[in-house]
Amino acid sequence: MALKKFHEFQPVCESQELNEGIFRNLISDFKNWVISFWKKTPEAKKVPKTPDYLSGEHMLYIPHQQGPDGAAKIFKAASGLAKLDPATRKKLLVNVPTGSVYYNTIKDPKQTSKQVAIAFLKYYSENWNLLKKEALSLITKPEYKKAKIAIDSIQNPQLPKEFLTTVAFKESSLNPNPKRNPNYKGLFQIGPLAWAELKRLMPFRYKGNKIPLDPKKNAQAGHDYLKITNDVFQKKLQS
């Protein structure tokens, strides 16, 4: 389900490029935010303050959508320290609706990699809470009972239930078997690459060629893959 558009994107000029020292602070700051989010502890005071588009729950979702390598590239590009190749720009574009004020910024080849990355991240940052609010208002309704039971059944959760509910809503509209791209399955829309990675890293839990459609199994796989991609993403930021 497409996120809704919200505030208008305001480009950042190239003179605001971040140096390596500030980038290291941003990475450290982001990692501290992730730890506080998972543990539900107060965030430490940020010096310098990380821009909203580089922190927040949407940044836990981007590695799932773009892959850890892609998410790290986007993070670095938004910090002025990496370039986005045409293939990456195209992938960003297909994940932003054409009606969004961000769409043309990402589409425009004259825009810098930094401007494109910031536009993409601002779109998700500024709309995530709207998506979350809608997801949480729906999950308690009888027609979404299967999705709620599945998310509640996740073993050893390391991500908050509200975040997982929002991701499931973003991926499948809380439908355990949406009729969309046949390569992606279930509540969390697990694809072939994600399934292969789950089997490689967690062979004790994931086996076989078929991605599970069972809501509980799919929700567990969705949770585990979100955790895996975020762990790898944070390592990629250091490389």
Feature map (PLM): residue ranges:
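Proteolytic processing junctions in secreted/extracellular precursors
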Residues: 6-21, 133
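Substrate-binding/active-site groove segments that recognize
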Residues: 36, 43, 181-205, 222-224
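Export/targeting segments at the very N-terminus of extracytoplasmic proteins
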Residues: 25, 29-51, 127-174, 216, ...
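Acidic helix/loop microenvironments that form the catalytic cleft of cell-wall polysaccharide enzymes
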Residues: 53-74, 168-172, 218-225, 236-239
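Catalytic and substrate-binding regions of cell-wall glycan-acting enzymes that process beta-1,4-linked
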Residues: 58-130, 238-239
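Extracytoplasmic/secreted envelope proteins and their assembly/folding machinery
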Residues: 61, 144, 148, 161-165, ...
